[in-house]
């Protein structure tokens, strides 16, 4: 059976340290003016017991199964690998930027060097190709990120999915993200 990669971001374990962002930049040589991954910090919010609470939201590609970015690409430069990772072939890209406009997660950007769209790809060309986990997962000091093969019932990601309540960002759009969120139980920030 083919691997299908996914990731979980546990908002209860995340401390907003940005180690994942820095590791991503270093591993993938991301220019300073753009990002594949950010952790947005919301807060503080004062809780009823007087303590302060922050909420940490991961902003990156959510690796959709039903990919709006792929379906609008006229040259098939945006595509889904056999392992479910949404990718960009820079050599096929004509720079129309339809994929950036179609992404409801604002996860793509124009690389200032290649002039083509780029996004998180779970470090597929570097770490994943060597049998390692994505850089962001490896450096997280609180283990807030879980990565793995969702087609393997015994994988760590499936064990976490079975044991914790999760949601998928903007799931109502029908995109079927493979990035799952364990929502903040500490009283996150209200919209």
From Swiss-Prot:
What residues bind [4Fe-4S] cluster 1, as annotated?
14, 17, 20, 140
UniProt keyword annotation of Manganese present = no
Q: Which InterPro entries match?
A: 4Fe4S_Fe-S-bd (IPR017896), 4Fe4S_Fe_S_CS (IPR017900), ET_IronSulfur_Cluster-Binding (IPR050954)
**In Gene Ontology terms, what is one molecular function of this protein?**
4 iron, 4 sulfur cluster binding
Q: Which residues bind [4Fe-4S] cluster 3?
A: 61, 64, 69, 103
Q: Which domain of life is it from?
A: Bacteria
Binding-site list for [4Fe-4S] cluster 2: 24, 120, 123, 136
Q: PROSITE patterns in the record, alphabetically? A: 4FE4S_FER_1, 4FE4S_FER_2
Quote the record's binding site residues for [4Fe-4S] cluster 4. Answer: 73, 93, 96, 99
* Start and end residues of each 4Fe-4S ferredoxin-type domain: 5-34, 50-83, 84-113
Q: Tell me which UniProt keywords the record has, alphabetically.
A: 4Fe-4S, Electron transport, Iron, Iron-sulfur, Metal-binding, Oxidoreductase, Repeat, Transport
Q: Which residue positions does the secretion signal occupy?
A: none
Q: How does it assemble?
A: Functional polysulfide reductase is made up of three different (A, B, and C) subunits.
* Job description of the protein: Component of the phosphorylative electron transport system with polysulfide as the terminal acceptor.
Name used for this protein in its record: Polysulfide reductase chain B
Q: Which organism is it from?
A: Wolinella succinogenes (strain ATCC 29543 / DSM 1740 / CCUG 13145 / JCM 31913 / LMG 7466 / NCTC 11488 / FDC 602W)
